[in-house]
From Swiss-Prot:
GO molecular function terms listed in the Swiss-Prot or TrEMBL record: ATP binding; metal ion binding; nucleoside diphosphate kinase activity
Domain of life: Bacteria
Catalytic EC class: transferase
The EC number(s) this enzyme carries: 2.7.4.6
Protein name: Nucleoside diphosphate kinase
Cellular component terms per the entry's GO annotation: cytoplasm
Gene Ontology biological process: CTP biosynthetic process; GTP biosynthetic process; UTP biosynthetic process
Organism classification: Bacteria, Pseudomonadati, Pseudomonadota, Gammaproteobacteria, Pasteurellales
Family annotation (Pfam families): NDK
Gene: ndk
Keyword annotations of the record: ATP-binding, Cytoplasm, Kinase, Magnesium, Metal-binding, Nucleotide metabolism, Nucleotide-binding, Phosphoprotein, Transferase
Record's subunit section: Homotetramer.
Amino acid sequence: MSLERTFSIIKPDAVERNLIGKILARFEQSGFEIVAAKMVRLTKAQAEGFYAEHQGKPFFEDLVEYMVSAPILVSVLQKENAVKDYRTLIGATDPAKAKEGTVRKEFAESLRRNSVHGSDSLESAAREIAYFFIDSEICSR
């Protein structure tokens, strides 16, 4: 099996509560290599562009407002089955429905303030990685 890459965001609520280290440690303990990472403060235009697929949905404006409210940590994670395994690790979007032991069950505050984002497919991962990183910023180990 070959290595895959997935995209992760540690969202404003988790950054504000100083959970970056704890969440990154969970990624590494689960076998992910962090091959790129950086802190970003999104502009409204960047947030709207990243979440363009949700434009017109009832939650879109609140999502954009939330994502520009504080810095985020974007990262590229690598391992076999990265997309599927990362989605399992972070748990359901709604932390009330997330399984015990998942990142969202442990750290998320609510459906809106759910601490992390993860790509839902290899195609999404490629698009999301390219939105934030150039190739030279990704360093396989």
